[in-house]
């Protein structure tokens, strides 16, 4: 008798007796592990977009780089910060004491909750809708508990908090993100030279990023790192100290290096000629030679004509098969008035000694090969001055017809073609027709030539024009204005459409960050995304394996109220499933968060990341219900609306909000259906 009692005590201490009791339910444990992996996969496919969606959308990182970084930080965060996941299901939403004598029902409920949450998250990922994984698992838990024990086991106050979070999370985070981006735009982006203010604000941005994210991670109280033993004042002191130290390092080391890099890469760029100093112009652009003396060009019969160039003398190197233009320029503001001449008729079919004097006083000298190709047939071609060329701002100040490689320092630059906007604009100013060149190119490429011609009512072919070609036409031939007016009268709707699209393009381009501003915010956005991914791995791994932890601990101990620590390998199991889901299907929701909802820039992306993280920290301490997904979506929409009211896809936002609204009911219904099958068909309770 004593030996039997001693054996029972030993087996009870080792947990062998409990294992034997729960052994008939081993199949439920195996099924739970399979479904938990699917749930982790769905969390990775949907929720991870919260961290790196804006970084991918702004172009700071590629999708592959985002997946690599997220895999590292999600896994590390899930292992180091996710040790509290066993409390999520067992003590958060339901009263586990009601399952003391029916452990198998709690195990079946955990499987049902994971299945319901996984199905709805996968469906949302397929629809490219970001939803809250926490709300999914909460709805599924409520669903199975209603079937198993009725209303007595549910804490309805938690459901009320979730409903409030639908409105509090996006609204609060959106306001904070909009305020932060408003100050960034006012004091940095809208300045003529945003670099000085950006460098001054850089230490503050880094300090806030480090401080907010460190506090968020330490306040989670991860027992594996000992954060649960640090008091609140200690967490605040450590966070502030690290933030100040980071600010000093950035101010004394990062800012000077960043300033030199910006000056080297952007300030001396030949495409931004107003920013070039005299030395850079002479070194990078040898064909642009300022000369205070007059330029003398040979005209007919060896006569030398003097042309004064008050702004900048343009001398191009004489080479075979190249065209050389030297002209007289005045102030760009009244250039149109100066070039209104009585007659624009010029015969350039018979140039004398390879040069000609144009009606506006300009002298054009070109090789014999080019002059032979200039056969006027009464048809002109002009090309739009493209806004992206980098020459738009100073196009009226400089003029040359050499190759781009002569002016651009990079070896990979392409030479100018005849249909290049810079060349065509130059020809328009000089009054040189390009009809023969166009005809020759049309014979070689008839399909492309047809794109640039329109047929008028009189049967004549006219070159398609838009608002940017009007100046070229006015300078080259006043008669072209008449044809342009006739075309405008005949196609008012087309002109209005082009003008609308042009204004939209200008507005969108105006909202883009300058290259030097992007450089300032790029690493900041990557840093905030990595911190967010690390915290996400510790927080949302509970959504993936919280029910699995409850299932495993109940099977192992036979007690629903066990206080056993969460095994590390279970956390790693959930982290691996999250990463696989991100790699396989994460791009869908990332596209919604980073591109489809509204365009993202590095500056706006940083504002979204930092403000949403700050919102989560503040709301958690105050006790307000919050959702990281809802915070991020609210920040994206508010910043996008502040940048441009037309930039937000409001239909997509409506669909996302509807998905939030139905998340709890749908996941709860699916979980309740599975639980009903377990209870009445399998367990027969």
UniProtKB/Swiss-Prot annotation:
Topology versus the membrane: Multi-pass membrane protein
Q: What is this protein called?
A: Sodium-dependent phosphate transporter 1
Q: Which organism is it from?
A: Xenopus tropicalis (Western clawed frog)
User: In the record, what terms sit under GO molecular function?
Assistant: sodium:phosphate symporter activity
Q: Taxonomic lineage of this organism?
A: Eukaryota, Metazoa, Chordata, Craniata, Vertebrata
**Similarity field:** Belongs to the inorganic phosphate transporter (PiT) (TC 2.A.20) family.
Its biological purpose is as follows: Sodium-phosphate symporter which preferentially transports the monovalent form of phosphate with a stoichiometry of two sodium ions per phosphate ion.
- Pfam families in the record: PHO4
Basic and acidic residues composition bias: residue spans: 496-513
Name the GO cellular-component terms: plasma membrane
Q: Where is this region: Disordered?
A: 482-513
The record's keywords, sorted A to Z, are: Cell membrane, Membrane, Phosphate transport, Symport, Transmembrane, Transmembrane helix, Transport
Q: Which InterPro entries match?
A: Phos_transporter
* Compartment(s) where it occurs, according to its Swiss-Prot or TrEMBL record: Cell membrane
* Broad class of the protein's primary localization: membrane
Compositionally biased, Acidic residues: which spans?
Answer: 482-492
Q: Where are the transmembrane segments?
A: 25-45, 66-86, 106-126, 162-182, 201-221, 234-254, 517-537, 565-585, 606-626, 656-676
């Amino acid at each position: 008798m004593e030996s039997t009692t001693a054996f029972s005590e030993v087996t009870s201490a080792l947990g062998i007796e409990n294992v034997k009791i729960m052994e008939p339910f081993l199949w439920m444990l195996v099924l739970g592990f399979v479904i938990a992996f699917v749930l982790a996969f769905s969390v990775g496919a949907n929720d991870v977009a919260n961290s790196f969606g804006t970084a991918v959308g702004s172009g700071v990182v590629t999708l592959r780089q985002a997946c690599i970084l997220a895999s590292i930080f999600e896994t590390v965060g899930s292992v180091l910060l996710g040790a509290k996941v066993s409390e999520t299901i067992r003590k958060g939403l339901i009263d586990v004491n009601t399952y003391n004598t029916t452990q198998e029902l709690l195990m079946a409920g955990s499987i049902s909750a994971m299945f319901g949450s996984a199905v709805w998250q996968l469906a949302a990922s397929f629809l490219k809708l970001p939803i809250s994984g926490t709300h999914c698992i909460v709805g599924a838990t409520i669903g199975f508990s209603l079937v198993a024990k009725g209303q007595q086991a549910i804490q309805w106050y938690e459901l009320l908090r979730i409903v409030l979070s639908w409105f509090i999370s996006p609204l609060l985070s959106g306001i904070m993100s909009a305020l932060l981006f408003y100050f960034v735009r006012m004091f940095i982006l809208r300045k003529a030279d945003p670099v000085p203010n950006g460098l001054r604000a850089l230490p503050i941005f880094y300090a806030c990023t480090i401080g907010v994210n460190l506090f968020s991670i330490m306040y989670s109280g991860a027992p594996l790192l000992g954060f649960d033993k640090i008091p609140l004042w200690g967490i605040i002191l450590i966070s502030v100290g690290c933030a100040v130290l980071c600010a000093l390092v950035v101010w004394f080391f990062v800012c000077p290096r960043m300033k030199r890099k910006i000056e080297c890469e952007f300030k001396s760029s030949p495409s931004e000629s107003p920013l070039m100093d005299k030395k850079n112009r002479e070194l990078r652009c040898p064909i642009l030679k300022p000369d205070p003396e007059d330029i003398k060009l040979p005209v007919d019969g060896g006569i030398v004509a003097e042309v004064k160039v008050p702004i900048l003398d343009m001398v191009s190197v004489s080479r075979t098969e190249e065209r050389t233009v030297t002209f007289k320029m005045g102030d760009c503001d009244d250039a149109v008035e100066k070039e209104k001449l009585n007659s624009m008729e010029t015969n350039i079919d018979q140039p004398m000694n390879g040069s000609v004097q144009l009606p506006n006083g300009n002298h054009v000298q070109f090789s014999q090969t080019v002059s032979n190709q200039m056969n006027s047939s009464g048809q002109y071609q002009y090309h739009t001055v493209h806004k992206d060329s980098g020459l738009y701002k100073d196009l009226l100040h400089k003029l040359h017809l050499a190759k781009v490689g002569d002016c651009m320092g990079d070896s990979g630059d392409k030479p100018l073609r005849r249909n290049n906007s810079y060349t065509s604009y130059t020809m328009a100013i000089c009054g040189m027709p390009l009809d023969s060149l166009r005809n020759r190119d049309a014979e070689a490429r008839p399909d492309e030539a047809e794109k640039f011609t329109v047929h008028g009512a009189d049967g004549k072919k006219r070159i398609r024009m838009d608002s940017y070609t009007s100046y070229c036409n006015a300078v080259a031939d006043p008669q072209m204005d008449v044809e342009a007016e006739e075309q405008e009268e005949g196609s008012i709707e087309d002109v209005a459409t082009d003008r609308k699209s042009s204004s939209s393009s200008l507005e969108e381009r105006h909202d883009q960050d300058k290259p030097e501003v992007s450089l300032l915010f790029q690493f900041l956005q990557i840093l905030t995304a990595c911190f967010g991914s690390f915290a996400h791995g510790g927080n949302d791994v509970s959504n993936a394996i919280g029910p699995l932890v409850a299932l495993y601990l109940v099977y192992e101990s036979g007690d629903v109220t066990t206080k056993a620590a969460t095994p590390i390998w279970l956390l790693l199991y959930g982290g691996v499933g999250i990463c696989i889901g991100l790699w396989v299907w994460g791009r869908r929701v990332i596209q919604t968060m980073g591109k489809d909802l509204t365009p993202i820039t590095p500056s706006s992306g940083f504002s979204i990341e930092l403000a949403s993280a700050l919102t989560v920290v503040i709301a958690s301490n105050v006790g307000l219900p919050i959702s990281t997904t809802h915070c991020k979506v609210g920040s994206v929409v508010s910043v996008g609306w502040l940048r441009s009211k037309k930039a937000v896809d409001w239909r997509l936002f409506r669909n996302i909000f509807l998905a939030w609204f139905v998340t709890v009911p749908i996941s709860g219904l699916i979980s309740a259906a599975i639980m009903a099958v377990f209870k009445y068909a399998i367990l027969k309770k």
